[in-house]
Amino acid sequence: MEVNTCNIQVLLQAAEYLERREREAEHGYASVLPFYSNGVSDKRKKQKSKSHSSPGNSRSVHNELEKHRRAQLRHCLEQLKQQVPLSSDSSRNTTLNLLRQAQLHIKKLQEQDERAKLLKDRLRWEQRELRTRLEKLQGGSERMRSDSLGSAVSSERSDSEREDVEIDVESMVWTLEADALGSSHAGVDHSYSTSDHAWL
């Protein structure tokens, strides 16, 4: 973002220079460049050292460099127009206004980026809190499940013991009934024997 801001500052200065040159061309006089890039100044020094004897050649080189620089600026401005929201009034969409809008747009994007970072940090913190709560709940449910399984096992044991007791009681009742039947049969046989003796 800082590099973009520096580029915007350079473009602002270039736009002011271009507008000043256009105004001066309308009035018929020229001005001096407010700043020079290192590459352009080095090239101009080399061209001056080579062509002291031919001022026409240096002038054509200067024009070519100026044309190249303007084409580069135009290309950058066209790219900037595609990324910066502009006003509907086309008369106000000058190069200077475009660069100022770009600067405001960059500040707005930086603020949105900061807000997004804060929101992301807050959501991460909430996610960690929810995970710890979920782990606690899962641990509690596992304990409850183990307790319920233990109670089910103990209830099954008590049911089986109750069935054993009932079976023992039934066997005791059965043996008692069998004993009673055996004794009654014995009594009947005895009475028959006594009656036989009486008849005899």
UniProtKB/Swiss-Prot annotation:
SMART domains recorded: HLH
GO biological process: regulation of transcription by RNA polymerase II
One Pfam family from the record: HLH
GO molecular function: DNA-binding transcription factor activity, RNA polymerase II-specific; protein dimerization activity; RNA polymerase II cis-regulatory region sequence-specific DNA binding
Location of this chain's protein in the cell: Nucleus
SUPFAM superfamilies xref list: HLH, helix-loop-helix DNA-binding domain
Assigned keywords, A-Z: DNA-binding, Nucleus, Repressor, Transcription, Transcription regulation
Domain bHLH: 57-109
Record field: compositional bias (Basic and acidic residues): 136-146
Main localization category: nucleus
Source superkingdom: Eukaryota
Annotated stretches, region: Disordered: 40-69, 136-165
One Gene Ontology CC term in the entry: nucleus
InterPro entries: bHLH_dom, HLH_DNA-bd_sf
CDD domains, alphabetized: bHLHzip_Mad3
Subunit structure: Efficient DNA binding requires dimerization with another bHLH protein. Binds DNA as a heterodimer with MAX.
PANTHER family: MAX DIMERIZATION PROTEIN 3, MAX DIMERIZATION, MAD
Task performed by this protein: Transcriptional repressor. Binds with MAX to form a sequence-specific DNA-binding protein complex which recognizes the core sequence 5'-CAC[GA]TG-3'.
Protein name, as recorded: Max dimerization protein 3
Species annotation: Danio rerio
Organism lineage string: Eukaryota, Metazoa, Chordata, Craniata, Vertebrata
Gene from which the chain derives: mxd3
